[in-house]
């Protein structure tokens, strides 16, 4: 992998004080975090949530509580990295990256996080307090916006990395 200077004169600093090389790495860090989250969400969509949907109501409370505890440990770091790097790319767009891509990435992240907060978290809360057979099935259905958004973030991240000259 190589990082191109993106046509910036040596020593030029961007508004946040980042050099073009740092911004190139920031794009790659953002892409990596998006890839991690896309991988996790596809696993959740096709393996974990269907299994939760089959959890008997008498054991659903314990499973839901443990799911929330364990999942938080897995997604906390990549979500934080993704969030901060997305904000940084909005504030300080790298040269060579078309302006629409950081905003598209932020919009897709807002969809993923909004779906998490407004759809998934309430359903997990319901499963942990008052489980029924419909909650697991609804988790599978309402998880699709997150799955699509995080998958599309990977595409946006690859486009930004290519525009920065990180590949090729």
Predicted feature locations:
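Transmembrane helix-loop-helix
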Residues: 88-110
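Juxtamembrane boundary at the C-terminal end of a transmembrane helix
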Residues: 159-168
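Basic polycationic patches enriched in arginine
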Residues: 2-4
């Amino acid at each position: 992998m190589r990082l191109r200077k993106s046509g910036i004169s040596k020593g030029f600093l961007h508004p946040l004080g980042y050099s073009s090389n740092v911004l190139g790495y920031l794009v790659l860090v953002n892409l990596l975090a998006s890839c991690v989250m896309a991988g996790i969400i596809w696993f959740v969509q096709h393996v974990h949530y269907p299994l939760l949907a089959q959890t008997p109501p008498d054991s659903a409370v314990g499973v839901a509580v443990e799911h929330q505890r364990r999942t938080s440990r897995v997604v906390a770091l990549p979500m934080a990295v993704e969030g901060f790097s997305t904000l940084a790319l909005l504030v300080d767009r790298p040269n060579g990256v078309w302006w629409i891509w950081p905003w598209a990435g932020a919009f897709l992240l807002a969809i993923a996080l909004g779906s998490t907060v407004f759809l998934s978290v309430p359903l997990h809360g319901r499963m942990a307090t008052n489980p029924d057979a419909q909650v697991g099935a609804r988790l599978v259905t309402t998880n699709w916006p997150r799955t699509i958004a995080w998958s599309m973030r990977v595409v946006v991240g690859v486009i930004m990395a290519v525009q920065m000259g990180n590949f090729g």
